[in-house]
C-alpha cells in the first residue's frame, strides 16, 4: 500500500504540479488511513477495500477527536487516491460510493480592526535587525494579503520597489502582481538596507528576502513562532494566526469600497466564491457598528 501511495504522490508532483505543502498533506492523510487499517485488518490489496472500511475509518478519526474539517479532508484525499488507482487499473471498484463528506459549519475569517492592526504592526523592536525584519514582514502581509508561504518564498528578484509592486507565485503556480503601499515600501527598504546585510552569512548564498538569524530563508513554522511572540507583546486579546492579516487585508479593502473581483485577483483566489466569504464578514461588522452607535439599535 505504501508503494502505491508513493506512486500517487509522484503523479501529483510530476503530472499535477502540486506544491510541496499540498503533497505533504496528501501523504499525511493517506498514511493516517493506512495506520488505521493496520489496526483494523491486514490490507495487502486496495481492491479488497469496502465501504465499511471507510465508514470505520471516519468513526475512528472522530473518536480520536479529529474535527469535521479534518475528516472531510481525509475523505477528499482518499477519493483522489482511489480515483488514481482505478484510472491506473490497480482498483476495480470505488469504496467511496455513497460515502458523504461530513458537513462543516462555515467559520468566518477572524479579522483585526484598524486599532489592533496598528498595535500589531508597531510591536516589533525595530532597534534590532530581527525586529526590523519582523516589522517588514507584517507590513507586507497587511499591505498585500500574501499567504505566509508566499511571503517566506519571496526572493530579491520579486521586489520591484521603484515601480511600487511585488510579484509572487501562488497556488497552482499562478503569478500575481501586487501593489505595495508607501508605508510597507519604506519599512521594507529600511530592512533591506539596514538589517538584511547583518543577517546574511557567507556560507548561505541565497536570495530570499527574509532571513533567519542563521542567514537562511525563513520557514512557515519560523514565521508562526515569530508572530505568536509579537501578538503576545502587542497585548491583543483576539487569537491571531498567520492568515489573520490576509483576512484583515481583504475585509478592510471591501469595507472601503473595493470591488470583489479586484480583491479576488489580489488574493489569488481561483474561484470568486472563496472571496465572497469576506462580504459576510463586512456585513457582520456593519451590524456591530449599527448596534454600537445607532440610538435605537
Swiss-Prot record:
Major location (coarse): cytoplasm
Keywords recorded for this protein, A-Z: Cell cycle, Cell division, Chromosome partition, Cytoplasm, DNA integration, DNA recombination, DNA-binding
Occurrences of domain Tyr recombinase (ranges): 107-291
Active site per the UniProt annotation: 147, 171, 243, 246, 269, 278
GO CC, alphabetical: cytoplasm
Summary of subunit composition and partner proteins: Forms a cyclic heterotetrameric complex composed of two molecules of XerC and two molecules of XerD.
Protein function: Site-specific tyrosine recombinase, which acts by catalyzing the cutting and rejoining of the recombining DNA molecules. The XerC-XerD complex is essential to convert dimers of the bacterial chromosome into monomers to permit their segregation at cell division. It also contributes to the segregational stability of plasmids.
Descriptive protein name: Tyrosine recombinase XerD
Gene for this chain: xerD
Amino acid at each position: 500500500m505504501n508503494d502505491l501511495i508513493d506512486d500517487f504522490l509522484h503523479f501529483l508532483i510530476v503530472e499535477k504540479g502540486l506544491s510541496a505543502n499540498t503533497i505533504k498533506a496528501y501523504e499525511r492523510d493517506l498514511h493516517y488511513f493506512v495506520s488505521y487499517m493496520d489496526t483494523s485488518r491486514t490490507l495487502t490489496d486496495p481492491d479488497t477495500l469496502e465501504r465499511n472500511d471507510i465508514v470505520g475509518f471516519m468513526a475512528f478519526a472522530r473518536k480520536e477527536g479529529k474535527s469535521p474539517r479534518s475528516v472531510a479532508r481525509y475523505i477528499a484525499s482518499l477519493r483522489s487516491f482511489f480515483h488514481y488507482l482505478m484510472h491506473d487499473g490497480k482498483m476495480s471498484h470505488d469504496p467511496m460510493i455513497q460515502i458523504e463528506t461530513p458537513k462543516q459549519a462555515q467559520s468566518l475569517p477572524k479579522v483585526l480592526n484598524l486599532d489592533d492592526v496598528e498595535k500589531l504592526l508597531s510591536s516589533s523592536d525595530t532597534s534590532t535587525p530581527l525586529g526590523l525584519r519582523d516589522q517588514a514582514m507584517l507590513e507586507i502581509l497587511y499591505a498585500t494579503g500574501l499567504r505566509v508561504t508566499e511571503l517566506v518564498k519571496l526572493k530579491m528578484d520579486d521586489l520591484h520597489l521603484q515601480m511600487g509592486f511585488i510579484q509572487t507565485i501562488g497556488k497552482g503556480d499562478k503569478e500575481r502582481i501586487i501593489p505595495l503601499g508607501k508605508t510597507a515600501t519604506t519599512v521594507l527598504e529600511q530592512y533591506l538596507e539596514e538589517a538584511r546585510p547583518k543577517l546574511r552569512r557567507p556560507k548561505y548564498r541565497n536570495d530570499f528576502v527574509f532571513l533567519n538569524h542563521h542567514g537562511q530563508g525563513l520557514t512557515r513554522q519560523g514565521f508562526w513562532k515569530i508572530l505568536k511572540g509579537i501578538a503576545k507583546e502587542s497585548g491583543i486579546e483576539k487569537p491571531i494566526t498567520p492568515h489573520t492579516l490576509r483576512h484583515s487585508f481583504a475585509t478592510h479593502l471591501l469595507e472601503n469600497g473595493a470591488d470583489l473581483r479586484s480583491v479576488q485577483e489580489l488574493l489569488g483566489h481561483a474561484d470568486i466564491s472563496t472571496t465572497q466569504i469576506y462580504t459576510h464578514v463586512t456585513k457582520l461588522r456593519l451590524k456591530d457598528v449599527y448596534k454600537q452607535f445607532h440610538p435605537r439599535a
